[in-house]
């Protein structure tokens, strides 16, 4: 007593080859057709002639300048990319180039770091008078 085997069948499809192999039409994706399509393809747009291409290239040369392309609207507010010398006077030039005193010598707390502990507590007059007395004693 053998059991009957149940077979699962695929839904009915058109069998072009008559056997178990199904013939499938290869479908090109539209992106490939647009990129690599042939001239005989009716879906392809016609190619632009050379004179139209030259016209398009000449239009590209007359584009907006770079300084106006990136959000700058008025020319009076526009800063030139390369600063000529007439824009900067000598005083402004010196002020721009001179480093600040803090960058040269550090903050006041940094300078006090090298003093002895009792020197920082003394007033300025005492320090000055003390140095004068030391000079007199040496003579």
UniProtKB/Swiss-Prot annotation:
A single BP term in Gene Ontology: neuropeptide signaling pathway
Alphabetical keyword list: Amidation, Cleavage on pair of basic residues, Neuropeptide, Secreted
Positions of post-translational Phenylalanine amide modification: 36, 70, 105
Biased composition (Basic residues): 22-37
Major location (coarse): secreted
Keyword Chloroplast: no
Region described as Disordered: spans on this chain: 1-48
Cellular component terms (Gene Ontology): extracellular region
Compartments, as annotated in UniProt: Secreted
Propeptide: 1-23, 40-62, 74-96, 109-139
Tissue expression remark: sNPF peptide 1: Expressed in corpora cardiaca (CC), corpora allata (CA), antennal lobe (AL) and gnathal ganglion (GNG) (at protein level). Expression in AL detected in all animals, in GNG in most animals, expression in CC and CA in some animals (at protein level). sNPF peptide 2: Expressed in corpora cardiaca (CC), corpora allata (CA), antennal lobe (AL) and gnathal ganglion (GNG) (at protein level). Expression in AL detected in all animals, in GNG, CC and CA in most animals (at protein level).
Job description of the protein: Plays a role in controlling food intake and regulating body size.
Family: Belongs to the NPY family.
Protein name per Swiss-Prot or TrEMBL: Short neuropeptide F
Native species: Agrotis ipsilon
């Amino acid at each position: 007593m053998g059991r009957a085997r149940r077979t699962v069948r695929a839904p009915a499809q058109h069998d072009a080859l008559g056997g178990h192999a199904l013939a499938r039409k290869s479908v090109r994706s539209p992106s490939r057709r647009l990129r690599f399509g042939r001239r005989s393809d009716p879906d392809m747009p016609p190619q632009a002639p050379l004179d139209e291409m030259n016209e398009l290239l000449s239009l590209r040369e007359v584009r907006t300048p770079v300084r106006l392309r990136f959000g700058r609207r008025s020319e009076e507010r526009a800063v030139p990319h390369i600063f000529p010398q007439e824009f900067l006077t000598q005083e402004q030039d010196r002020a721009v180039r001179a480093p600040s005193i803090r960058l040269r010598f550090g903050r006041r707390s940094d300078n006090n770091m090298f003093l002895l502990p009792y020197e920082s507590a003394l007033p300025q007059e005492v320090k000055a008078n003390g140095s004068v007395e030391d000079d007199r004693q040496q003579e």
